Amino acid sequence: MPVAKLIQKTKSGVKPTTLALATILLVACAGGVEPPKPADLGPNVSLLGVKLAWTSQTGPVTFPLLAKAAGTTVAVAGGDGLVALLDARTGQDIWRTQIGNPVSAGVGSDGRYVAVITQANDVVTLEAGREIWRQKMPASSFTAPLVAGARVFVLSADRSVTAFDAASGRRLWAQSRPGEPLVLRQAGLLVAVGDTLVAGLSGRLVGMNPANGSSRWEVPIAVPRGTNDVERLVDLVANVNRQDDQLCVRAYQAAVGCVNTGRGTSLWVKPANGAQGLSGDDRFVYGTEIDGKVLAWKRVDGERAWESDRLKYRGLTAPLAVGRSIAIGDNTGTVHLLSREDGSPLNRLTTDGSAVVAAPLLVGETLVVVTRNGGIFGFRPE
């Protein structure tokens, strides 16, 4: 049964709790009703030539991983504290190191600096495989640090944003604001768009000055509604799609929307029931819903372009638009390549049989996939 991993904010920090996504699921579970089973996909139709180029390994991934590409490198981490920077062309280590503490969020990288957050609430930054500093945070974090502009930015579970000097670890500024008492135990939204730091704070997209954290603009994507904390939970999730100044994002189980970050204005918002982030191209924005539907919205106005229920109940990741396809991982370790035009199948790729834990990532010409068991797989066009 799918569950929402939630964190409850308290005066002394945050504490974890696990709550069902919907009362009906709790009732169904109590009544012994089996969850829906995915339909058989039938034989693979290989209409797009892709081959496995290399494999690597990290520790089992027990946290909300976001692998990070920078140039021809990809930064990854395992839950046990292993952090590695790989050459995405060959899969070979550039370096790997053990930081000595389990990881709760990562990875952030600009190709030079790599940053993760530990379960002890430490921000740890490495350079050339060597730890150069760590700083204690006042609250947990489940969002990968953002490394940009010689700074390391951290979005914490108490919805505070903190900036550090990437080389020295000196704290530059911190901004916090009141929010709802529950937050997701899932990677949130923290990205750079030009000279603006963009963060998801509750259901609002906030553009900040990276020099001091002051707010430049705010755009609501979802508004808290309901009579209890669970119903009022709104958070923006990781994996966004950017085209020039347009940033398209998802509010957990509430909406998808696109914002003009240059003007700080909403372009459109549409209701949607998904938990994973988005991808897109110049025509469409792509996403997966809680039940496994794959949807495409028209970028210009948010109207539905197509939907596919072929992958329902397969525990899908966020999609990645790559070439003429979109790539989506599932909970069996399969990567599905679907047509951007209508969602029809183009190919299926296999990994190690454990769930794909992060949206597939394109690094140069290599499609990088990471699984729950710590398998790292590089695929290339044939």
Model-derived features with residue positions:
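Structural signature of WD-repeat beta-propellers
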Residues: G78-G79, T118-Q119, S156-A157, G200-S202, ...
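Loop/turn-rich, solvent-exposed surfaces of beta-rich toroidal or solenoidal domains
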Residues: T288-A296, E303-L337
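Short loop/turn segments that connect beta-strands within beta-propeller blades
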Residues: D87-T90, E127-R130, D165-S168, P210-N212, ...
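C-terminal motif of bacterial Sec signal peptides marking the signal peptidase cleavage site
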Residues: L26-A28
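Extracytoplasmic beta-rich repeat domains
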Residues: G32-K68, W95-G111, I132-A148, R171-G194, ...
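Blade-level signature of beta-propeller repeat domains, shared across WD40, Kelch, NHL, RCC1
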Residues: T351-E382
